Amino acid sequence: MGRYLKERNPAVQIIAVEPDGFSALLGLEPGLHVIHQIQGIGDGFIPSVLDPGLIDDVITVSDDDAVYCTRKLSRTLGLLVGTSAGANVYAARILSARLGPGSRVATVLPDRAERYFSTALL
């Protein structure tokens, strides 16, 4: 997705999201597993489908912020998503504040909440 966007507009910035205190993308030793609550990201490796050369920056998000945003998406917008989606939206809000008025920020919501129904998440 990042390559496609940059081919269409070289000014596009690709921002990765990682759990707070851990980021293989920021140079933490790959394979080091840190316990966090944001399922689906920060698993201690860089996936083969990811080209780190396309990433312009990394925003880290705490467990609490990811869970808060996930719950807010559910309660205010009816979006039943998981914590990686909550982390992405939280990071998008941080980026939007950094870039200021008139900027455009897009993100993806990569998961759904059905696997979390038996947890305290929702």
Predicted regions and their residues:
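Short glycine-rich anion-binding loops that position phosphate/pyrophosphate groups of nucleotides
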Residues: 20, 86, 111-113
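Phosphate-binding loop/pocket of nucleotide- and phosphate-handling active sites
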Residues: 44, 90-122
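Active-site/ligand-binding loops adjacent to catalytic centers
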Residues: 7-83, 120-122
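Surface-exposed amphipathic alpha-helices with a cationic face
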Residues: 2-9, 96
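Short glycine/serine/threonine-rich phosphate/pyrophosphate-binding segments
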Residues: 1, 84-92
